[in-house]
Regions:
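Sec/Tat-exported extracytoplasmic proteins
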Residues: 107, 112, 122, 162, ...
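Secondary-structure end/capping motifs
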Residues: 258-339
């Protein structure tokens, strides 16, 4: 689920002369090389080592979408990885799917990705386990183009319309069809247009009638006269349309390494739990300040801070133990459109023995 492609933020300029994984970057890094994994975010966010770690560097890859980043950078900034004896290198990827591929391919030790990507990877034969949650709602809203805002007021109104998406076979496509069916609408009457990463402008210009976006694209479209038909970054909409919490971002590991890494995994979850608590306590400005300069270069930081202030309570849990029911809701959505086999169960890809232990 490449929600990082739909946020409306400009991405850092590619740094082409940086080496790949063999170069150590103390606190944050980048995975380069399309031969290794497709769609990596090629920028290095430099950090300063804050203390001696007891263990070797571990690499944790994750999506570079702005709303995915805070739990990990706030944890790092608070020194909680270091306090647990961990030397964690945060590896910024261009999307959740790329981070999942890096984990499955053995390029990184852990990956923080959307749960739908984990399920789809397991469906394709990958052997990975999800063991900790850092975002409990999908970072998505169905934005209506400004020129259609008065015409589209329900999922039934999507019949005969064109909806933009980054790529075919995505969670957003499944979610559209799933929600249309629940509303009694005919999903066969909607057209999906593949727009690639630059999805904001086509919606703003009315080249498509609607599209699944995240922030700040949603706020920018609202300023232009658009609106959200549904915003799953808000608890009320998630409860109304999805039935409650809907598992999104969290950390996974290769199943074969669980036994050897168990204590390390527990230390990682303890650090992240402290980071999630800090994320709710500190000022929104401090969240923005914790992000790497390369990531926020050219970004309206005041707007970004407002977004963190608005959504942090709804998006980020204070306890990262996996909610099995929330995970099953994701699986049900994917099964509806055949993205995973009917026999795939969310619980089979979870390791519930780590968090809280």
């Amino acid at each position: 689920m490449d929600c990082c492609e739909t946020d409306g933020f400009k991405r850092p300029v590619e740094i082409r002369d940086k080496p790949t994984l063999e170069k150590t970057v103390r606190r944050r890094g980048v995975l380069k090389g399309t031969a290794l994994v497709a769609s990596a975010v090629p920028f290095v966010a430099g950090g300063v080592k804050r203390g001696a770690a007891k263990s070797a560097t571990i690499q944790l890859a994750f999506c570079s979408q702005m709303l995915c980043v805070p739990p990990y950078e706030v944890t790092r900034d608070g020194g909680y990885f270091r306090d647990e004896g961990l030397d964690v290198q945060l590896v910024y990827m261009r999307g959740s799917t790329a981070a999942t591929q890096a984990l499955v391919g053995g390029a990184v030790d852990y990956a923080a990705t959307s749960f739908d990507d984990v399920l789809q990877a397991v469906n394709r034969g990958a052997d990975i386990k999800r063991f900790y949650s850092t975002a409990r709602l999908p970072l998505l809203a169905l934005a209506i183009a400004p020129n259609k805002a008065t015409e589209i007021n329900s999922f039934k109104d999507l019949e005969g319309r064109t909806i933009g998406e980054v790529s075919r076979g995505s969670l957003s496509e499944s979610m559209t069809l799933f929600l249309m069916k629940k509303a009694g609408a005919d999903g066969k009457k909607v057209t999906f247009a593949v727009l690639g990463p630059n999805i904001y402008e086509p919606v703003r210009l009315g080249q498509v009638d609607a599209a699944w976006v995240t922030e700040p694209a949603l706020s920018l479209l609202v300023k232009e006269g658009g609106k959200a038909l549904v915003n799953f970054m808000e608890t009320d909409d998630a409860n109304k349309y999805l039935g409650g919490r809907y598992e999104f971002m969290g950390v996974s590991v290769r199943t074969a390494e669980v036994a050897a890494r168990r204590e390390e995994m527990r230390a990682l979850t303890r650090a992240l739990e402290k980071g999630l608590g800090r994320l709710q306590r500190i000022k929104p400005e401090e969240i923005t300040a914790a992000l790497p300069k390369q990531l926020v270069e050219g970004v309206d930081t005041a707007q970004l801070t407002d977004i963190f202030s608005r959504y942090r309570a709804s998006l980020y849990p204070t306890v990262g133990v996996e909610d099995v029911a929330a995970c099953e809701r994701v699986a049900d959505t994917l099964k509806f459109t055949g993205l995973i086999k009917p026999e795939i169960k969310a619980e089979q890809v979870l390791d519930l023995s780590i968090a809280g232990s």
